[in-house]
Amino acid sequence: MAENQYYGTGRRKSSAARVFIKPGNGKIVINQRSLEQYFGRETARMVVRQPMELVDMVEKLDLYITVKGGGISGQAGAIRHGITRALMEYDESLRSELRKAGFVTRDARQVERKKVGLRKARRRPQFSKR
């Protein structure tokens, strides 16, 4: 496919992102759509751009991303994790900077399951004294 392409897998909640990085001019393509088309919310776009802005490579690399599962926030987090891993494969010296910002660690928080006899994961049914 490409001569010098770097890959990273990112996960968050129930989303999984595959990120390919190539030298270029800062184009970000997510599921064959631009970043602006894919994410309507500015916060999600900001989360995706964070690792690139941290290491000053916004205009130096092109990103090709496929993401599946979850919602907007989970997908944005998965993409950020994938970009971080791909950047570390591209240049290992960026690891400490990315680690300090907290992008390397996989956010392990998952939705807690609903339990039998409860209304939600922890919410109990209303108690009636009489």
Curated annotation (Swiss-Prot):
Q: Which domain of life does the UniProt lineage start with? A: Bacteria
Record flagged with keyword Ribonucleoprotein = yes
Looking up Gene3D superfamilies in the UniProt record yields: 3.30.230.10
List this protein's GO terms for biological process: translation
Alphabetical list of InterPro entries matching this protein: Ribosomal_Su5_D2-typ_SF, Ribosomal_uS9, Ribosomal_uS9_bac/plastid, Ribosomal_uS9_CS, Ribsml_uS5_D2-typ_fold_subgr
Offer a single GO CC term for the protein: cytosolic small ribosomal subunit
Q: Identify the SUPFAM superfamilies for this entry.
A: Ribosomal protein S5 domain 2-like
Tell me one GO molecular function of this protein.
Answer: structural constituent of ribosome
Q: Which one Pfam family would you cite for this protein?
A: Ribosomal_S9
Which keywords accompany this UniProt record? Answer: Ribonucleoprotein, Ribosomal protein
Give the NCBIfam families listed for this entry. PRK00132.1 (NF001099)
Family stated for the protein in its record: Belongs to the universal ribosomal protein uS9 family.
What name is this protein filed under? Answer: Small ribosomal subunit protein uS9
Natural source organism = Shigella flexneri
